[in-house]
Amino acid sequence: MLQPKRTKFRKMFKGRNRGLANGTEVSFGDFGLKAVGRGRLTARQIEAARRAMTRHIKRQGQIWIRVFPDKPITSKPLEVRMGKGKGNVEYWVCQIQPGKVLYEMDGVTEELAREAFALAAAKLPLKTTFVTKTVM
């Protein structure tokens, strides 16, 4: 699973997920999966979608993951009273704004890419859309 090797601080404020995304263009591959909605992806969801795509394209072509879970999410154990500090880090998430390209693919046909991205999108909690590289 993806997570940072080192961080400056162990825990992070909750924060807000506002604004528009950077990384809105398909830059590495020919096809991409772009987020339409706003939310957050856990490292497990990112990995599950990657596995679904990789299995569908049967090791042909190449996949790029354009998101990285760099925000720690903490939680307190069950049946623990309030107070006594912030809980332990349970998992890592990546905050997603609308327009962010999540995955890219190259070396496969458009039909196969659409099918693979549809399988990946079913694993994600966001609305997504299929995009192609724009050549100028």
UniProtKB/Swiss-Prot annotation:
Gene Ontology terms: cellular component: cytosolic large ribosomal subunit
Keyword Transferase attributed: no
GO molecular function: rRNA binding; structural constituent of ribosome; tRNA binding
Protein's GO biological process: translation
Coiled-coil ranges from the UniProt annotation: none
Pfam families per the UniProt record, alphabetical: Ribosomal_L16
SUPFAM superfamilies in alphabetical order: Ribosomal protein L16p/L10e
Entries under Gene3D superfamilies matching the protein: Ribosomal protein L10e/L16
Keyword terms: Ribonucleoprotein, Ribosomal protein, RNA-binding, rRNA-binding, tRNA-binding
InterPro entries: Ribosomal_uL16, Ribosomal_uL16_bact-type, Ribosomal_uL16_CS, Ribosomal_uL16_dom, Ribosomal_uL16_sf
Family annotation (PROSITE patterns): RIBOSOMAL_L16_1, RIBOSOMAL_L16_2
Function summary: Binds 23S rRNA and is also seen to make contacts with the A and possibly P site tRNAs.
Quaternary structure, from the entry: Part of the 50S ribosomal subunit.
PANTHER family: 50S/60S RIBOSOMAL PROTEIN L16, LARGE RIBOSOMAL SUBUNIT PROTEIN UL16M
Family per record: Belongs to the universal ribosomal protein uL16 family.
HAMAP family linked: Ribosomal_uL16 (MF_01342)
Record's protein name: Large ribosomal subunit protein uL16
